[in-house]
Amino acid sequence: MKILLDFLPIVLFFGSYKLYGIYVATAVLMAATALQMALIYAIDRRLQTMHKVTLALILSFGALTLALQDDRFIKWKPTVLYGAMSVALALTLWALKKNFLKLLLGSQLALPDMVWLRLNWAWIAYCAFMSAINAYVVLHWSTDAWVDFKLWGYVFPLVFLIGQGLYIAPHLKNQGRT
């Protein structure tokens, strides 16, 4: 059920874009994301920080897109989101000497510190890559191509998360043997 909720806004955005254009699609994305968050809250009785940030950015950038009739705002939202995540992970690691991923997931996954550090670096690199690739697509491709990229670009996080799982798995198996 939750996986369907994750895809709801992007599928509705894509469909409405193909039928009605970027401004209707932006309004649909805003409404679908708000509905998605309401449903997640109804199921979990809480929203994670990432959900709140995503909703705030979609509503903010979407409102600017609609009010100013300028699609650049909604197209830059992923660049800002991923860039901010990359910077936040790096600053937490360097300035605060804390591993944000370990703080977030350490109670659920017992992993060696070196594994947490590598995961953190992988997330920093992944978020920086996603920010950069979205910026490239926004700057060099048409809005039609950007929308297609947004839909098919959902493969990137799936591949990344599968890779993370494959990296973590041997370390979890080793825990049971000690």
Swiss-Prot record:
Cellular component GO terms, alphabetical: plasma membrane
Top-level lineage group: Bacteria
Record keywords: Cell inner membrane, Cell membrane, Membrane, Transmembrane, Transmembrane helix
Cross-referenced InterPro entries: YciB
Membrane topology: Multi-pass membrane protein
Membrane-crossing residue ranges in chain numbering: 10-30, 47-67, 76-96, 121-141, 151-171
Compartments, as annotated in UniProt: Cell inner membrane
Pfam families: IspA (PF04279)
PANTHER family, per database record: INNER MEMBRANE-SPANNING PROTEIN YCIB (PTHR36917:SF1), INTRACELLULAR SEPTATION PROTEIN A-RELATED (PTHR36917)
Function: Plays a role in cell envelope biogenesis, maintenance of cell envelope integrity and membrane homeostasis.
Homology family: Belongs to the YciB family.
Protein name: Inner membrane-spanning protein YciB
Lineage: Bacteria, Pseudomonadati, Pseudomonadota, Betaproteobacteria, Burkholderiales
